[in-house]
UniProtKB/Swiss-Prot annotation:
Originating species: Nostoc punctiforme (strain ATCC 29133 / PCC 73102)
Record protein name field: Phosphoglycerate kinase
Gene coding for it: pgk
Known pathway: Carbohydrate degradation; glycolysis; pyruvate from D-glyceraldehyde 3-phosphate: step 2/5
Main localization, broad class: cytoplasm
Enzyme class, first EC level, given as a word: transferase
Gene3D superfamilies cross-referenced by the UniProt entry: Phosphoglycerate kinase, N-terminal domain (3.40.50.1260)
Complex formation: Monomer.
Entries under CDD domains matching the protein: Phosphoglycerate_kinase (cd00318)
Family: Belongs to the phosphoglycerate kinase family.
């Protein structure tokens, strides 16, 4: 899926032209509306700065939250302010994403100026990928850049619909980097390739586990979903989370791994709690000895050693999903140990890819984000790409 990228456009191609850039500025904010983490805004800077330096007029479009119609609490005003600080130049803000006010402000733009449209999801037509709305969004621009990997798995007006009206339609630097790392890891990895899949439910990770069984040399499973595998093996799991309707699936995944010669590794010990709370009583036991009335909330120290040994000779590692309930400090050790392990093996040339979602938060929590080869900005989009699915927002871009 090789796509035309912004890097292929020179100053001569785009100077004075109006660029509609889809970014993902869906950042977390506190009760006062202050941004608590600007990672997503900073992630878009290389694309925005390249466009301004090449003399384009930059029009940014993003969603923010899940508004039902216009919602003053979900306006992009704090984002415009933060982006202005990061760019060191004024970011012009509109109160709408289409219409006369937008057209007038775009017409007044000088080369190298940046304008941020209001939250595109104020219009229900955005998520319906309405062609008329897409046409209105596109009307103010000459070409299109998609740098919002986090929404690339959605066929919305600002991610897919606008490409029908704007040419060229290219990938921004963030999207290009995501595709390069995630697709390479699946299609052409340095081996041995290991995947670490965590999270609470097998059901949400079935697709990715099945695809990775075709590609991986080792598959490490952690998080709440391990108990469905244990129960399928006939072990007692106390009151741990189990998806009863997925027991047969767990058996078939283990059988499939065996058949394909893939090492499917489950934890050997677990940290138990007497209830689901940050201050619960805890004990560590082997997986054969889980007593009634207790639930597993993390992997144990022996499992950490077992996984570290399995990862020692790998050349590529993809990690998606935590090993336990890392939001509770008492049950965060397993997840944090995996983060430290990846940072260590990364120093000796192993490519370490953090595939979006909670594992990103975990790596950031322990301050190791800058020691990973690549941290994906997309949760659902990363998973779907790892599953081998076509992402509509990427498919719609011009081929390289």
């Amino acid at each position: 899926m090789s796509k035309k990228s912004l890097a292929s456009l020179s100053s001569a191609d785009i100077s004075g032209k109006r660029a509609l850039v889809r970014v993902d500025f869906n950042v977390p904010v506190d009760d006062q509306g202050k941004i608590t983490d600007d990672t997503r805004i900073r992630a878009a800077l290389p694309t925005i700065q390249d466009l301004t330096q090449k003399g384009a007029k930059v029009i940014l479009a993003s969603h923010f939250g899940r508004p039902k119609g216009v919602d003053d609490k979900l306006r992009l005003t704090p984002v415009a302010k933060r982006l202005s600080e990061l760019l060191g130049q004024e970011v012009i803000k509109t109160d709408d994403s289409i219409g006369d006010e937008v057209a007038a402000k775009v017409a007044a733009l000088q080369n190298g100026q940046v304008l941020l449209l209001e939250n595109v999801r104020f219009y229900p037509e955005e998520e319906k990928n309405d062609a008329e709305f897409a046409k209105k969004l596109a009307a103010n621009a000459d070409f299109y850049v998609n740098d919002a990997f986090g929404t690339a798995h959605r066929a919305h007006a600002s991610t897919e619909g606008v490409t029908k009206f704007l040419s060229p339609s290219v990938a921004g630097y963030l999207v290009e980097k995501e595709l390069q790392y995630l697709q390479n890891a699946i299609e052409n990895p340095q081996r041995p390739l290991a995947a670490i899949i965590g999270g609470s439910k097998v059901s949400s990770k079935i697709g990715v586990i099945e695809t990775l069984l075709e590609k991986c040399d080792k598959l490490i499973i952690g998080g709440g979903m391990i108990f469905t595998f244990y129960k399928a093996r006939g072990l007692s799991v106390g009151k741990s989370l189990v998806e009863e309707d997925k027991l047969e699936l767990a058996k078939s995944l283990e059988a499939k791994a065996k058949e394909r010669g893939v090492a499917l590794l489950l934890p050997t010990d677990v940290v138990l709690a007497d209830n689901f709370a940050p201050d619960a009583n805890s004990q560590t036991v082997s997986i054969e000895n889980i007593p009634d009335g207790w639930m597993g909330l993390d992997i144990g120290p022996d499992s950490v050693k077992f996984f570290q040994e399995a990862l020692a000779d790998t050349k590529t590692v993809i990690w998606n999903g935590p090993m336990g309930v890392f939001e509770f400090d008492k049950f965060a050790a397993g997840t944090e140990a995996i983060a430290h392990t990846l940072a260590e093996i990364g120093k000796t040339g192993t490519t370490t890819i953090i595939g979006g979602g909670d594992s990103v938060a975990a790596v950031e929590k322990v301050g190791l984000a800058d020691q990973m080869s690549h941290i994906s900005t997309g949760g659902g989009a990363s998973l779907e790409l790892l599953e081998g699915k076509v992402l509509p927002g990427i498919a719609a871009l011009d081929d390289a």
